Amino acid sequence: MAIDETATDFDQQVTGPLTVVDFWAPWCGPCKMMDPIMEKLEQTYGDRSKFVRFNVDGNQDIAQRYHVMSVPSLVLFRDGQAKEKVTGVYPEAKLAHYFERKIAE
């Protein structure tokens, strides 16, 4: 299950080989569409990468730090450094292909 993260220890949670941070908000319709997709992807790739959910409501400092201007946005971290950002809703198969490539890097 993805870790629901707060700003308190965000930097600690994004360390490691590959961490996928799902920036979302409870009022966001597209975020709700992504929830089941992200759950399936975490089941598939959770043994090879970490999945973190970050609610941007009340935590705008972290979102701004990584230039997250809209949700849903996925930011991929390697060893604590933000490497890529994907914004919007994508089909499960497209994200699965993307994660396969990123895990292999």
Regions found by a protein language model. Give the residues of each.
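Structural micro-motif
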Residues: 19, 60, 66-75
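Short active-site neighborhood of thiol/selenol oxidoreductases, capturing the structured segment around
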Residues: 14-24
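CheY-like receiver
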Residues: 12-13, 62, 98
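Thiol-based oxidoreductase modules, predominantly thioredoxin-like and allied folds used
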Residues: 5, 23, 35-42, 46-61
